Amino acid sequence: EEENMTQSRTHTCGSLRITDVGKQVKLVGWMENFREVGSNLGFVVLRDFYGTTQIVATDEEMVATFKGITKESTISVSGEVRERSSKNDKLETGDIEIVPMQVEVLGKCRFRELPFEINRSKEADEAIRLKYRYLDLRNAEVKNRLILRSKVVAALRKAMMDHDFMEITTPILTASSPEGARDYLVPARKHPGQFYALPQAPQQFKQLLMVSGID
């Protein structure tokens, strides 16, 4: 079958199972770790949004290739799925590993030493976490909170829609209406010297909707 050149990967790092043994696959992810066992054997943990997959380098050339790649670099790995000799029951992909035939660095991480270990980012200083937020969000625990929030919001929205509620989005820029708090002003591009403000509450917009008959 001819390869689709527009497809960056055939599977995610969390999708391969024992039933995929023998398949030729292509994964894209961040190199979480490389453990060198010998000159012709090494293990890579490849991670993306969906999980991790073990890559096993079985020759000197491939071991040298992975040794030259910094942690958290974005790489593409093409190879064959095989059954692991020692399985990891804690991982959904723990029954398999990939024997790579081709490795391509898509984006090299410029840090030889990361500002913090990805899986322990919550222990880092808050200012450092915010500065390198894109690394912090690769932490599964942090990422899963975003996923949970998305599911909760979706469930609430569905429940409200099932009760015939209608979702309305009110403007995020309006005329300034100073109250107790200071307005956050945004200059008007077409009207020099005038400003929009972030609304402190959607009260007026909701009242307009009620007068319009939307109850």
Tell where the protein language model's regions lie, with residue ranges.
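Class II aminoacyl-tRNA synthetase catalytic cores and aaRS-like
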Residues: 1-215
